[in-house]
Amino acid sequence: FLPIPRPILLGLL
């Protein structure tokens, strides 16, 4: 996942 467009996804993981 790209940390720029979807920073929320990284937080969930």
From Swiss-Prot:
Annotated transmembrane regions: none
Gene Ontology biological process terms in this record: defense response to bacterium; defense response to fungus; innate immune response; killing of cells of another organism
Coiled coil region boundaries: none
GO molecular function annotations of the record: toxin activity
Protein's cellular compartments: Secreted
Keyword Secreted: yes
Leucine amide modifications at: L13
Tagged with keyword Protein transport: no
Organ and tissue specificity: Expressed by the venom gland.
Gene Ontology cellular-component terms listed: extracellular region
Keyword line: Amidation, Antibiotic, Antimicrobial, Fungicide, G-protein coupled receptor impairing toxin, Immunity, Innate immunity, Mast cell degranulation, Secreted, Toxin
Record function comment: Mast cell degranulating peptide. Shows antimicrobial activity against the Gram-negative bacteria E.coli ATCC 25922 (MIC=30 ug/ml), the Gram-positive bacteria S.aureus ATCC 2592 (MIC=10 ug/ml) and the fungus C.albicans ATCC 2002 (MIC=25 ug/ml). Has little hemolytic activity. Its mast cell degranulation activity may be related to the activation of G-protein coupled receptors in mast cells as well as interaction with other proteins located in cell endosomal membranes in the mast cells.
Family of this protein: Belongs to the MCD family. Crabrolin subfamily.
Name listed for the protein in its UniProt record: Vespid chemotactic peptide 5f
